[in-house]
Amino acid sequence: MTFNDVIGNKNVKQHLLELMLQNRLPHALLFLGKEGSGALPLALAFAQLIICQPKSSPVVEDLFGGMSAISNEPSFLHPNDIESSTSYSKANLLVHPDLHFSFPFINKKNSDSSTISADYITEWREFLMQSPYGNLYDWLQVIKAENRQGNISAKECLEIIKKLSLKSFESDYKVLLMWLPELLSKEGNKLLKLIEEPPPNTIFIFVAENEEKILPTILSRCQLIKIPLPENDEVEEALLKKANIEPEQAKQIAAISNGN
């Protein structure tokens, strides 16, 4: 997933790039956008950029006995400089070991409370690949939830704490992308200390639709990134590029889509 794959929101993309390239990246961000805004694919594209940065230069002893980096390269590189890398290919396939996901799910068995997001990782990867603009209903259909409601459980929160306490594998950074933190309920309070005092180079990216349903204690610890719905002309342009339809038809569809 790249920024170019996400419809519209040029200003948001530019803001995110500036945060990264100017080394002003906060440790917790909340991407807030209505269904159809592209908040999830945009967050995913941004997460990929973070974990695919080249490893920091090693430090060596200088002439005065201090430790200095071999290179004074900037901490973050522009997307154009990393999109051909092996790590970017892994991230694009959603298999990079330092990119972690958390999302609503149902227990594998009705009486089993040990289920975690990782138990659905294969389905989740397929969902993101095939339906990056999908909604909660679409996802619950994929995992055959039937009439059961998905949530993010206490067990899942403990698993997040465990995963993020480990060192990164290939990147300088670890990123947790959590979709729909509205479904954390009070269990999310287990994450507060980790969000407030994360291990070095650990980034939380929350993707939400309804600000009012997010725990205030989590909301207050995040930098808010509002994702508006794409404009009609942006939807029209995307349809012409990706759907291979006539210009007039693209214009009509964009007009009635209301950005969705």
Q: Where is each model-derived feature located?
A:
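Active-site catalytic pocket residues across diverse enzymes, especially alpha/beta-hydrolases
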Residues: 50, 54, 195-198, 243
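Short regulatory helix/loop adjacent to the ATP-binding pocket of P-loop NTPases
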Residues: 186-196, 210-223
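Long, charge-dense, solvent-exposed interaction surfaces that engage phosphate-rich ligands
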Residues: 224-260
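A short beta-strand-to-loop transition that corresponds to the Sensor-1 phosphate-sensing loop
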Residues: 179-181, 206-211
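Conserved catalytic/switch belt of AAA+ P-loop NTPases
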Residues: 165, 189-205
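Clamp-loader machinery-focused feature within the broader ASCE/P-loop NTPase space
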Residues: 2-186
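Phosphate-binding Walker
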Residues: 40-41, 202, 217
